[in-house]
Amino acid sequence: MRKARNFFFFLLSILWLPACGQKTFDEKMESLYRNTVPVIQADKLKDKLTKEEIYLLDTRAPEEFGVSHIAGAHLIDFDNFKISMAREIPKDAEVVVYCSVGYRSERIGEELLAAGYQHVSNLYGGIFNWKNQGNTIINKNNQPTDSVHTYNKNWSQWLYNGIKVYE
């Protein structure tokens, strides 16, 4: 009887851990976001990418983008961003920005909205959440990869599904 009870609690804890991790991830996102740019969930973006023309902007550093990015994304380096970099994008086009977790991309999204872009959204949880949800990413050679540049060891804790690359 005692073994069965211990096994039950062990099984319950295993089932409970993933939900706990997502809650913690969501709490972290809530603490980072200013909620100044609408968010789009990974599953909705995945669906839209197959049906609509979307300008997908990766706002991470070039070395992060080189490790992996979402197929079809264009690099808009956060550290060197100028609104003129987006001049080729029509102001009424749908634009989705992302970074590692959504913090840097939200700042770029704010600038795009302030410049008159009408349909800007921020990928919730960034490329980390995209990959955590099991979606495909590609490397600089346009080949599928599981590697994600996690910025540093501290931020690596938020990537649950993939190979963590930093430094």
Regions found by a protein language model. Name each.
Residues 55, 94-96:
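Structural motif
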Residues 8-18:
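Bacterial N-terminal signal peptides
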